[in-house]
């Protein structure tokens, strides 16, 4: 059952990411900011030619290689541990979805569409795929910590 559900969830997460980016591009002009939840979240449309926090601008070949490697390793690990803990499955599904969501942008557009601006903190503008990656990495750390505390060293 997991072999069916996980790919479906992955496709749905990628679709949500891509639809959010398409909506932003259609409804908000480049570099425009629109208040969404006052003093908490604004929406904007930025083109990110780099990585997180706009580092390594215009290094698309590097991001392509890194994404192929990370997503490939995550898929292989997921297939080998399909009966693993829910923390592990959730984390890998989110990492794969986030990586592929931004990868699609880079292949299709040559940049990643970013749109979420947190008004209450000075933080980088990000997108839904970035959120998947961040939450996925946190869940992976929890999964590995739980495995370690249970004496499971796979």
UniProtKB/Swiss-Prot annotation:
Enzyme Commission code: 3.4.23.36
Entry keyword Protease: yes
Reaction catalysed by this enzyme: Release of signal peptides from bacterial membrane prolipoproteins. Hydrolyzes -Xaa-Yaa-Zaa-|-(S,diacylglyceryl)Cys-, in which Xaa is hydrophobic (preferably Leu), and Yaa (Ala or Ser) and Zaa (Gly or Ala) have small, neutral side chains
Topological category with respect to the lipid bilayer: Multi-pass membrane protein
Compartment annotation: Cell membrane
Any Gene Ontology CC annotation: plasma membrane
Primary site of residence: membrane
Active site, per annotation: 114, 130
Signal sequence, start to end: none
Keyword Secreted: no
Single Gene Ontology MF annotation: aspartic-type endopeptidase activity
Protein family (similarity comment): Belongs to the peptidase A8 family.
PANTHER family hit by this protein: LIPOPROTEIN SIGNAL PEPTIDASE
Protein name: Lipoprotein signal peptidase
